[in-house]
A protein has these predicted regions:
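N-terminal export signals
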Residues: 2-8, 12-28
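TPR/TPR-like (Sel1-like) alpha-helical repeat modules
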Residues: 100, 104, 115-128, 268, ...
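Residue at a conserved register position within TPR or TPR-like alpha-solenoid repeats
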Residues: 69, 103, 146, 186, ...
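Solenoid-like repeat scaffolds
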Residues: 87, 169-171, 218, 248-255, ...
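TPR repeat positional signature
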Residues: 62, 96, 103, 139, ...
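Residue-level recognition of tetratricopeptide repeat
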Residues: 58, 91-92, 175, 222-223, ...
């Protein structure tokens, strides 16, 4: 039995999210196990079909739906669809295979312990019925048996599984599903680790690209191939390589909220913020239709439904659409938990609870910030720290140094809480890292307020370095790029050339965002480069065309 580093070293995002919202109706299968009740057949699941999966039309429809839902990162609902396929055709070996596959690990989550026994039972049934399956499903069942050599969730041999799938992709060179499943397994082995910091591909990335490219050539509308291609290239130096797949996903599976959302990952990297916002609005609507049909809770709701609101905020903020952005932050928490109470000890729920504070800071709503109720003491150290940060920023930006200093002292005390080092936001970055940026930013605001502009620049340079050192997440967990503040501080210091470099750096991170375009215009103008400044002003006007707030500085 092989217990790989894949299983041992990471307890990734979705397992941490599944228990974040509590309540009596959450009793039952935890994490990503099958949802309760009979599986519905949803509208809008696209045209993906698997003719050799099952003998009955109903089972084939459930099977195809399960595959699409799994590729749309809703494994609990996918498992329920495979159970529907089994109910319609109990002797369907492929349907049992699908259930075992859906309960396994993904690029976002290791296998949940509670899913191990159901997966083992489904795989056992698939193996018992394999003689009735098509040749390729017999091969897939045998490959999945390599992945799950024992019943434990930590007994995953992903490397052995990938080796079998690589061989099957070669054996079936005209089979898009085989290529996607092989690529998926290799992605699982190296989650989000496909590009080096300098933009060069990792040693395994070329094979992932080749497998997915083959699948897309064979089946341009394959939901899994398009989804994984976007994830692969959103982190690359050339995110535009996934623009065709992003466009396809806008309409490919209108019933999958997550697949509708996926184009936004490329839109944000390529400066198409209006399209990113629209993609998330469509995904929110699709998930609302889905949630009206099923009582989905746990990982999908917390990890993906709320994520759409978070992403909408990020896109709308880059457009200057304050009303849409602020409303999106206020909707994230309810989207995560619905009517269930949330556990503020969960880093992801504290993250969603903090979003409205960040939004009010981003848009300079100082008086609204000062009326925000202090969070209760207890297990929400991150939320409390960011409340102090937001209030301190409001005091500093309204010219109240004594109050701002008191808030900074409270923030520094809150930052010393040991809990912050172990509280992970979306199981990616420690809350302490973000609180550190908050301390540096508030120190800079206070220094600028009392005329110590050079000191303010120094604090903000440290904040930029701290932000750059964070692990990647999209949207970025620090919700107002620190380069906006640094560039503004450099302009205040008369250091226009340095400000220009900072704003150009930010525009490489967030192309055509109005905040940095405005800052760049000011920096060029102060250097006497009026022709260039006018060209950038035209770009700013295009970027800010849908804004509902005026902008005279690169930050409020």
């Amino acid at each position: 039995m092989q217990v790989t580093a894949f299983a041992l070293t990471r307890r990734r995002m979705l397992l941490a999210l599944g228990g974040a919202c509590s309540g009596p109706s959450l009793a039952g299968p935890p994490a990503q196990g099958p949802a309760r009740g009979a599986a519905p057949l949803f509208d809008g699941m696209g045209d993906y079909r698997v003719p050799d999966a099952a003998p009955s039309p109903l089972a084939r429809r459930y099977f195809a739906q399960g595959m699409v839902l799994a590729w749309g990162f809703n494994p609990a609902e996918a498992a329920r669809s495979f159970e529907g396929a089994i109910a319609a055709s109990p002797s369907c070996a492929a349907c049992h295979w699908g259930l075992a596959w859906a309960l396994g690990p993904t690029i976002n989550a290791d296998m949940a312990p509670a899913d191990a026994l159901p997966a083992a039972a489904a795989l056992q049934q698939a193996r018992a019925l394999a003689s009735q399956a098509s040749p390729r499903f017999r091969d897939l069942i045998a490959a999945l048996a390599v992945r799950h050599p024992g019943p434990g969730a930590d007994e995953i041999d992903e490397e052995g599984y990938f080796a079998r799938l690589r061989a099957l992709a070669a054996k079936y060179p005209r089979d898009a599903d085989m290529a996607v499943l092989a690529a998926e397994s290799l992605l699982n082995l190296h989650p989000s680790d496909w590009w080096q910091p300098d933009g060069q591909a990792r040693p395994w990335t070329g094979e992932i690209v080749a497998l997915l490219a083959r699948a897309l050539t064979l089946a341009p509308d394959h939901p899994g191939a398009n989804h994984y291609w976007v994830h692969l290239f959103e982190l690359s130096p050339n995110p535009e390589r996934a623009a065709p797949q992003a466009e396809r996903l806008r309409t490919l599976v209108p019933g999958s909220g997550h697949l509708l959302h996926m184009p936004a990952h490329i839109d944000m990297r390529t400066g198409r913020y209006a399209q990113a916002a629209a993609a998330n609005q469509r995904s929110i609507e699709a998930d609302e239709r889905y949630l009206a049909q099923v009582d989905a809770q746990g990982a999908y709701r917390v990890g993906y439904v709320a994520h759409n609101h978070h992403f909408l905020w990020a896109a709308a903020a880059m457009q200057g659409r304050s009303q849409v952005a602020i409303a999106a932050t206020q909707a994230a928490w309810p989207a995560a938990c619905g009517p269930r109470p949330g556990d503020l000890g969960s880093g992801v729920l504290q993250h969603y609870a903090v979003l409205p504070l960040h939004a009010l800071v981003r848009f300079g709503r100082w008086q609204e910030l000062l009326t925000q109720t202090r969070p209760p003491d207890g297990n929400a150290a991150y939320l409390l720290a960011m409340w102090h940060y937001a209030r301190g920023t409001a005091w500093a930006r309204t010219g109240r140094p004594r109050e701002a200093r008191a808030a900074l002292q409270a923030l520094q005390s809150a930052a010393a809480e040991p809990e912050l080092a172990t509280t992970k936001l979306k199981n990616i970055n420690p809350a302490a890292d973000l609180v550190h940026i908050a301390v540096l930013t508030l120190q800079a605001d206070l220094a600028a307020l009392v005329g110590r502009h050079d000191q303010a620049v120094g604090w903000l340079q440290q904040a930029v370095a701290a932000e750059d050192a964070m692990a990647h997440d999209e949207p970025h967990l620090w919700l107002a790029p620190t380069r906006h503040a640094l560039g503004a501080a450099l302009l205040d210091e008369g250091r226009a050339g340095e400000a220009e470099r900072v704003f150009r750096q930010d525009l490489r991170h967030y192309p055509e965002n109005g905040w940095s375009l405005l800052g760049l215009k000011h920096a060029l103008r102060r250097q006497g480069r009026e022709r260039e400044a006018k060209a950038v002003q035209a770009r700013f006007q295009a970027a800010w065309r849908d804004a509902d707030v005026g902008l005279t500085r690169p930050r409020f």
